[in-house]
Amino acid sequence: MSPLSEYALRMSRLSARIFGEVARSTDSKSMKVVSLFSEQPLAKKKETYDWYPNHNTYFALMGNLRFLGLYRDEHQDFKDEQRRLKKLRGKGKPRKGEGKRATKKK
C-alpha cells in the first residue's frame, strides 16, 4: 500500500482539528490530558447540579403553604414580628423621596 500523499495528510489533520480529534498521534500522557479536556466539565454533569433541590421552587412553595396556614416557619414569623414592632415604634423604612438625602436638599 502506498503512503498517504501530502494533501491527504493535510486534509486528515484539518478534519481532526475541525471535529475535535487529536491531529497528530501523541504519547499516553498527552492522550490522558486530551481525554480529560474532552470530558464534560464537572459543573455540567447531572449528578453535580442535581445534588441539591431547586431552592427557589421550594422557597415559593413553602411561602404559599405558610400563607395558607399549613406550614409554620418560626424564623420568618420572628422576622415579621420584629418588622411589625419596628413599624409601631416609627422606625420603619421611609417612603420613596422621604429619606435622609431628600430632607437635606429642602
UniProtKB/Swiss-Prot annotation:
Residues 81-106 are annotated as: Disordered. Residues 95-106 have a biased composition (Basic and acidic residues). It comes from the Eukaryota. It is found in: Mitochondrion. Keywords: Acetylation, Mitochondrion, Ribonucleoprotein, Ribosomal protein. InterPro entries: Ribosomal_mS33. Pfam families: MRP-S33. GO terms for biological process: mitochondrial translation. GO terms for cellular component: mitochondrial inner membrane; mitochondrial small ribosomal subunit; mitochondrion. Belongs to the mitochondrion-specific ribosomal protein mS33 family. Component of the mitochondrial ribosome small subunit (28S) which comprises a 12S rRNA and about 30 distinct proteins. This is Small ribosomal subunit protein mS33. It comes from Mus musculus. The gene is Mrps33.
